[in-house]
């Protein structure tokens, strides 16, 4: 297995340029069967050029699968039109179906594999068999065309119910409208963060500044020794964000239910949290040999 990792000395670290990804594909194309990449990178929040990367990898004879956990419900996707071979995702992030909810699968129609003898190279559970023959008990697998043919067993009714409830909300709008609102929300967040950075410092935005290269998320890399106190202070102010050790927090205003007022409240809380964390860090720095954080006042 070959991993595609950002170059640490690169001025764009930790981002991955499309050209760099393509160069790694070319370097290993002769002995690569499958390319698996995230649509949006979970750590940096970078949105990859799915269409371009897919086309290039396929031109080198590589089967392309996308992990869309952080992309589905976040950015518009046209998997069939982009000729993606297959994709998978969860539904508890931007789809809002809740933890443990059922995931999703896309399989391009050309990869349906509905005729023998290729069935042995695929998932072939009984729930993926055609409905007309599913209970015939012939010991013969006849898959349903498309992603449905890759199901193994009947899904949980409770999981489906929570997903359907969320999809009903999405159906009241469309991804183009949600994406437009998301760009404005995250753009507003970015603008306030840039102003705070100039005033307080102590963090950098590592997510691409180009809205077309990101979703709702902005990842903020904190200066050393601030993360734990910042997270504690945000929690005490009823602000929920995500942390990635050792020094990154992920902030994602969701266009379905967050508004510009929420973004403003976050910035005020984050500014206060940074100031408290910096004070604690400075106090600890004058205590030789201390390996414990002082309690915040």
What are these regions (language model features)?
Residues 1-297:
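Pyridoxal 5′-phosphate
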């Amino acid at each position: 297995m070959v991993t595609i990792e950002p170059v640490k000395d690169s001025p764009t670290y930790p981002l991955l340029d499309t050209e760099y990804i393509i160069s790694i594909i070319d370097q290993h194309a002769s002995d690569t069967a499958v390319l698996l990449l995230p649509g949006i990178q979970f750590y940096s929040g970078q949105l990859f050029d799915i269409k371009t990367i897919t086309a290039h990898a396929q031109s080198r004879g590589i089967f392309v699968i996308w992990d869309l956990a952080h992309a589905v419900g976040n950015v518009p996707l046209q998997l069939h039109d982009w000729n993606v071979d297959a994709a998978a995702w969860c539904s508890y992030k931007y789809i809002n179906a809740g933890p443990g909810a059922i995931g999703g699968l896309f399989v391009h129609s050309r990869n349906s594999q509905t005729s023998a003898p290729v069935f042995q190279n695929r998932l072939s559970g009984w729930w993926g068999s055609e409905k007309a023959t599913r209970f015939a008990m012939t010991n013969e697998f006849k898959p349903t065309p498309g992603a449905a043919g890759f199901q193994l067993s009947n899904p949980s009714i409770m999981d489906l119910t929570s997903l359907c409830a969320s999809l009903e909300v999405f159906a009241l709008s469309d991804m183009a409208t949600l994406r437009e609102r998301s760009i404005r929300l995250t753009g507003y967040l970015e603008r306030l963060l840039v102003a705070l950075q100039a005033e307080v410092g102590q963090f950098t935005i590592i997510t691409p500044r180009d809205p077309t290269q990101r979703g709702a998320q902005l990842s903020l890399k904190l200066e050393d020794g601030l993360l734990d106190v910042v997270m504690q202070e945000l929690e005490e102010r009823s602000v929920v964000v995500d942390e990635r050790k050792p020094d990154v927090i992920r902030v994602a205003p969701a266009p379905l239910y967050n508004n510009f007022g929420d973004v403003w409240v976050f910035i005020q809380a984050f500014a206060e949290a940074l100031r408290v964390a910096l004070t604690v860090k400075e106090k600890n720095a004058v205590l030789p040999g201390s390996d414990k954080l002082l309690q915040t006042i």
